Amino acid sequence: MKPINNHSFFRSLCGLSCISRLSVEEQCTRDYHRIWDDWAREGTTTENRIQAVRLLKICLDTREPVLNLSLLKLRSLPPLPLHIRELNISNNELISLPENSPLLTELHVNGNNLNILPTLPSQLIKLNISFNRNLSCLPSLPPYLQSLSARFNSLETLPELPSTLTILRIEGNRLTVLPELPHRLQELFVSGNRLQELPEFPQSLKYLKVGENQLRRLSRLPQELLALDVSNNLLTSLPENIITLPICTNVNISGNPLSTHVLQSLQRLTSSPDYHGPQIYFSMSDGQQNTLHRPLADAVTAWFPENKQSDVSQIWHAFEHEEHANTFSAFLDRLSDTVSARNTSGFREQVAAWLEKLSASAELRQQSFAVAADATESCEDRVALTWNNLRKTLLVHQASEGLFDNDTGALLSLGREMFRLEILEDIARDKVRTLHFVDEIEVYLAFQTMLAEKLQLSTAVKEMRFYGVSGVTANDLRTAEAMVRSREENEFTDWFSLWGPWHAVLKRTEADRWAQAEEQKYEMLENEYSQRVADRLKASGLSGDADAEREAGAQVMRETEQQIYRQLTDEVLA
């Protein structure tokens, strides 16, 4: 870029009435300091110009090529030293940039209020202009640019991309079309736009993330892809070479209206003993996830008898504007169309009773709304799994609030169920890792649903729609049941002694014993903690390692609590 030497630039950025006619490059350090000091005095009370000037002076005196003026709430910039090559002015309140600037190779202006950019330095290699919500277009890009991050702006078009570009991150804009992609491009992140088609992919591409667009087709994929995300588009078919991608590649095709034929073909191909392709994440779709929600009170009252609907509606109208109320309304409507709702006797009454409990507890309602927040994004089995989780939330809340204070047997039964579900989640997580074509929701729900009776899981639905695509076999279920019972026999009492609801009961019903246990814990930590951590680090040869010290400290803390709370639990349950 040319040296800054126009008077209007200095007046607009420094507020000076008179300024030297010499170019910035020729001004001495004293002149720089004078200009910056005047600029600092004329700033608003919210700007941290004094700190900015301090950093500018250090940069000038040391000839440091990197200048960081981020997070200072600056609304304008003073003249900058010409020797700097990397400039970070992110997370300020700038609405424009000067037309002239140093010969930068790296520029970070993300998190400002820019609505237009000046001509960019021709030597620029890396540019970050993300999170400028009013920025709708870009100037011509420098010829040697290698990395462009323009995430979450309001861009509607992109200029021609330089051939040197290797990284392009433009998620969360308003793009409907992309220009030709450079042949060296390795990372393309363009999720959350309005794209209906994509240009041909360069073979150099390693990471392709184009989720949440309006794509109806996908061209042939580069064979060296390491990550592919095309979730939440309008794809009904996939390129044939998707199954020939490397085995280490993660592929996400969930949220697309893929035909049953396509899904069955993929499942058949990926289940072959000879398959060595990528792991593919998908979701079963029933075509309802984009339906509009209705008012919360209407969705709730539909679960109640007609003679109660007026009173229920009046109560729930008060919750219409609570966080996640809209998605909770949609969840209730989707829940009514699940297999369990249609086939399980008393299901409607069960839901109505649960809704009454939610209306009486703001804390439980808040927790439940949050649990249901993402439940309608996929198929009805996601809704069913969410219903399982909501019933768990209710029971744990009731236990913490005292429902089982006088019924230790019922609390133990609830604890056993929560323990079994936790183990099943571990088993499901391990199973997901072994599958090449997987909908995680179906795997998690399959273990709960198919073992609900044998493991006495009162919170689990008894039917699911898409068990056939879960990949969970009869042998998996037998192995899981045996593992749950074995771990329950060996681990449950230790787990229960650390369970939060059990602690809440002890605080209320065994206050003196609880206080003694807490005192014992703190005495042990005060007298033994440091030495036990030091001994553990010494034994492993990691003395002085901060990360190892944190890990050892957490282990000692858990062992201490395990010892004390297990002793207390044994005494109370004896």
Swiss-Prot record:
Region (Linker): 285-292
PTM per Swiss-Prot/TrEMBL: Ubiquitinated in the presence of host E1 ubiquitin-activating enzyme, E2 ubiquitin-conjugating enzyme and ubiquitin.
Reaction catalyzed: S-ubiquitinyl-[E2 ubiquitin-conjugating enzyme]-L-cysteine + [acceptor protein]-L-lysine = [E2 ubiquitin-conjugating enzyme]-L-cysteine + N(6)-ubiquitinyl-[acceptor protein]-L-lysine
Entry annotation: catalytic residues: 379
TM spans (from-to): none
EC category: transferase
GO MF annotation list: ubiquitin-protein transferase activity
Every NEL domain range: 295-574
Keywords carried by this UniProt record: Host cytoplasm, Leucine-rich repeat, Plasmid, Repeat, Secreted, Transferase, Ubl conjugation, Ubl conjugation pathway, Virulence
GO-annotated biological processes: protein autoubiquitination; protein polyubiquitination; symbiont-mediated suppression of host innate immune response; symbiont-mediated suppression of host translation; ubiquitin-dependent protein catabolic process
Region spans: Interaction with target proteins: 1-284
One Pfam family linked to the record: NEL
Start and stop residues of the LRR repeats: 63-82, 83-104, 105-122, 123-143, 144-165, 166-183, 184-205, 206-223, 224-246, 247-270
Subcellular localization, as worded in the UniProt entry: Secreted; Host cytoplasm
PROSITE patterns assigned to the protein according to its UniProt record, in alphabetical order: LRR, NEL
Domain of life the protein comes from: Bacteria
Domain notes: The LRR (leucine-rich repeat) domain forms a slightly curved solenoid and may mediate interaction with target proteins.
NCBIfam families: IpaH_Shig
Protein family per UniProt: Belongs to the LRR-containing bacterial E3 ligase family.
Role: Effector proteins function to alter host cell physiology and promote bacterial survival in host tissues. This protein is an E3 ubiquitin ligase that interferes with host's ubiquitination pathway.
Protein name per Swiss-Prot or TrEMBL: Probable E3 ubiquitin-protein ligase ipaH4.5
Organism: Shigella flexneri
